[in-house]
Design a protein with these regions (language model features):
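Ribosome-associated translation termination/rescue signal centered on the conserved GGQ peptidyl-tRNA hydrolysis loop
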Residues: 1-124, 128-129, 140, 166-177
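Helix-turn-helix DNA-binding elements, focusing on the entry/boundary residues of the two helices
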Residues: 132-133
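The alpha-helix within a helix-turn-helix
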Residues: 136-137
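Helix-turn-helix DNA-binding helix
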Residues: 147-148
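DNA major-groove recognition helix of helix-turn-helix
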Residues: 151
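C-terminal flanking helix
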Residues: 155-159
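Short amphipathic alpha-helical segments at helix boundaries and their inter-helical linkers
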Residues: 161-163
């Protein structure tokens, strides 16, 4: 199933495609935490992806966090295929145009709502170029250094990019730190 089939769904529509479990989480929090089933596990039925949140004593807060983590998992683990001929038009996509600066750099932070859709597209392009960062950067209309900086911004994106490169027989990327 391609990511594009669910990315436009609101929370209620997405939850309708999921199985939601609540349970008692262990750990600190005292009597309230030990007596209430505040931890939430959401499993997307068709993809099998699972997201868990158990850090809050509020089931409602944990449900919101688990749903956000499920959306992140979709962007990280599900790829929308891009054919090699379609790579030339990727840099014109609306989700990239909204975050690209006049200098040609992605200006979007990890907490920005646009971050995960852009990260998903970047990983799609990286897969289409068989993990070649320079080719992916060219298709995205940014420099290789800016692409590396973007991937490094979120450890989960960095890890996924390296797993993708490994699948294509490429060496892992090294951090600039």
């Amino acid at each position: 199933m391609a990511r594009s089939t669910w990315s436009g769904l609101n929370d209620a529509q997405l939850l309708a495609q999921c199985e939601v479990d609540t349970y008692r989480a262990s750990g600190p929090g005292g009597q309230k935490r030990n007596k209430t089933s505040s931890a939430v596990r959401i499993r997307h039925l068709s993809s099998g992806l699972i997201a868990i949140a158990e850090e809050s004593r509020s089931q409602h807060e944990n449900r919101v966090k688990a749903l956000r983590r499920l959306r992140q998992a979709f962007y990280l683990q599900m790829r929308d295929p891009i054919d090699v001929q379609g790579l030339t038009s990727v840099s014109q996509r609306a989700e990239l145009a909204s975050v690209r600066s006049p200098a040609g750099k992605f200006e979007v932070g990890r907490k920005d709502v646009r971050f995960w859709p852009v990260a998903g597209l970047v990983l799609d392009v990286l897969e289409a170029t068989q993990g070649r960062v320079s080719d992916a950067a060219g298709a995205l209309g940014i420099s290789t250094g800016h692409l590396i900086d973007f991937l490094e911004m979120e450890p989960k994106v960095w890890q996924q990019a390296n797993q993708l490169r490994q699948r294509f027989g490429q060496k892992p990327l090294k951090t600039g730190n």
